[in-house]
């Protein structure tokens, strides 16, 4: 399946809903097409954009979304396409008595991006039960990568034997069993935690990556003495969240992020990375 569009406005599919036109937008289930695109260059793979800001008016780039959602469950293995949402993956696993995704399923992302960002929530991490990744490298070769070949970091992975620009199209996980009641309990725990601790606003979730010993919202609360920039506001109930506004220039959101980074750097001497990927 291929959906191919020229001069496409990404506000139709992006969380931020701002005007950003790319030269080509392609949704596909075809691995062969993706292989050819990679060999041509000039591409960007996206998921559901829950962690992306498109900060351009027009860009000559191919934006690719892999939408294949096949999943097979074997006795000891799960094989899943990277285009499947964590929500759907979690529901299928819960219904089959498989643990490892019942808390992660509350993250509004696709599997591929979640692996690339080594997503975690509470005590579950997407890489916990990971065994292999099936990828296409930058040269267009199909590769199988063992978990042991992956450097797992906070909110990112690094496959040292590969150049950047590879594409993850499948993941293989080991099966870990739990009872239906345990899975339901964990799922409800995650949902209730989000309701209680995270603001119910239109946002891209946490703006900044936490440090190993302190939460960024605590640093913002301590050192940042402003609350908004040209209409964009720091959420006062959780200061690592910024509310999205369709009626405002997205570049002013970026400027607010940069101002926060500057203040924190001047006070603690560290540059705080964003969880959000900003595409110029």
Protein language model features and the residues they cover:
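A general secondary-structure signal for short beta-strands and their flanking turns/coil
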Residues: 21, 128, 166-168
């Amino acid at each position: 399946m291929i959906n191919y569009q020229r001069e496409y406005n990404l506000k139709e599919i992006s969380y931020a809903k701002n005007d950003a036109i790319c030269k080509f937008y392609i949704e596909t289930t075809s691995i062969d097409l993706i292989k050819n695109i990679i060999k041509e260059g000039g591409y960007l793979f996206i998921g559901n954009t829950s962690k992306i800001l498109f900060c351009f008016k027009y860009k000559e780039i191919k934006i690719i979304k892999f939408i294949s959602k096949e999943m097979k469950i074997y006795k000891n293995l799960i094989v899943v396409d990277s285009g499947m949402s964590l929500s759907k993956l979690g529901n299928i696993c819960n219904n089959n008595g498989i643990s490892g995704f019942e808390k992660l399923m509350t993250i509004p992302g696709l599997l591929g991006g979640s692996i690339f960002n080594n997503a975690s929530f509470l005590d579950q991490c997407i890489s916990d039960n990971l065994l292999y990744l099936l990828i296409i490298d930058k040269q267009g070769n199909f590769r199988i990568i063992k978990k042991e070949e992956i450097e797992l970091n906070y909110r990112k992975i690094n496959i040292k034997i590969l150049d950047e620009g590879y594409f993850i199209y499948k993941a293989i996980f080991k099966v870990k069993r739990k009872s239906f009641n345990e899975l339901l309990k964990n799922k409800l725990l995650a949902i209730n935690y989000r309701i209680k601790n995270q603001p119910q606003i239109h946002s891209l979730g946490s703006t900044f990556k936490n440090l190993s010993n302190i939460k960024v919202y605590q640093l913002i609360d301590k050192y940042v003495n402003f609350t908004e920039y040209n209409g964009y506001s720091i959420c006062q109930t959780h200061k690592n969240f910024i509310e999205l506004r369709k009626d405002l220039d997205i570049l002013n959101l970026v400027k607010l992020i940069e101002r926060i980074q500057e203040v924190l750097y001047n006070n603690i001497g560290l540059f705080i990375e964003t969880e959000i990927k900003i595409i110029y």
